[in-house]
Structure formats: C-alpha cells, structure tokens
C-alpha cells in the first residue's frame, strides 16, 4: 500500500490446486444450496468434496442440469462408515423427501449392489466401497444411464450403444422439472465422504493418477470418457 496507510496483503500459506475451470469454461460442482441437505453436510475443495453427516435421508445435487446430450463425470468414495445407505445417480425433483423415492430419482447403491428408483430396490451390478471411483454416463438423447466402478462398466454396459441401451441401469423418464442433476444421497444415519471430478482432474486435492481419453470438450478424468460424451461444463452445455 503506497498510500501510507499500511493496508498491505500478507502472503498466505497452503497449496494451490491447478484446475481447468475458468470464466470461459465453468465446471459443475455440488450445490450446498440444494433444498434437501438442510445444512447438515459440509463442502470443501470448491464444493467438489461432500462430507455426509449422520443425519438420515439426505441428498445434494450439482450446480448444472441437463435435458439433452451425453454427460460423464466421476466421483470417488473417499471414506465411509457404511456403504449400505450411500448411493450415486441423478435427480430431477430436488424437493423430494429422500433420494430415489420418486419416478425421476435414479440411484446406484453400494452395499448391497442395487439400483433404486421410485422406492424400488433391484439387485444390479457389483458392490462398491471406500477408495472406489464411480463413473456416471447419462445419455439423454436415448434416456439411458450407466455406472462404472474403477473404469469397468457394470452389467457389461456400453454407453455408446444408443437406443439399444446395452447394460444400462435404467431407461429414464423425461425430467419433470426440466432438468436432471448429478446427485449423491443416503438414506440413514451413516457418514461418508465423496469427492467429485467433473473434469478438473482432481478428487479433492489429489490429481487423477493416469488420465484417460477425454471428450471433445476439455476435461481430465481418471478413466476414458465414452465416445460422444462430454464433461458437465458451460462449454459442454453450449455445444
């Protein structure tokens, strides 16, 4: 401060995380303003890490929604107290009372391995646990959703199979709210931490270990992005 008032900045500590996020291409994050987490969970690392507190039946959704196109993101199960009640997926009706209890809520449960929609639980895929990376591919052009564990598409899924929907978890309805959003939820008093990678190349502050093949829109993921899919970003939404 050259004014003589000594309003000087102090050099701070810490480590900077280099990301692709910029004004020209903003990446999705999780949304702490979501109506149904009720302030119970904590968010860090640019709202990409979600610490699920012990409150029951809560979920949060992402900041960007979609009604068409093909989208891919990853989320790492960092730690848990119980995988039984945690699930990943998408949601349209974000004012619902619990995850996947409506016709427009779709989830993949870790233990036991189940898919969940409209309160119906069906055995599907393999179990996942702490340390696993779950990939989500949503094909809104054909109304299909696919899930992978550590790069392996469950039920021999093929996100590029179009209307055939080979190995898809669900044929999803058109979003009643106009959009679907990425979601993480749980249904009982268990705790857990999830870190999302919407294409910035990090889970929390840890960079992906071996970046896969990206889509046409800039993004860095642990595993290959299925052909024709894009990261959930402002540039991707406007292509």
Predicted regions mapped to residue ranges:
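PRY/SPRY (B30.2) beta-sandwich protein-interaction domains
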Residues: 1-239
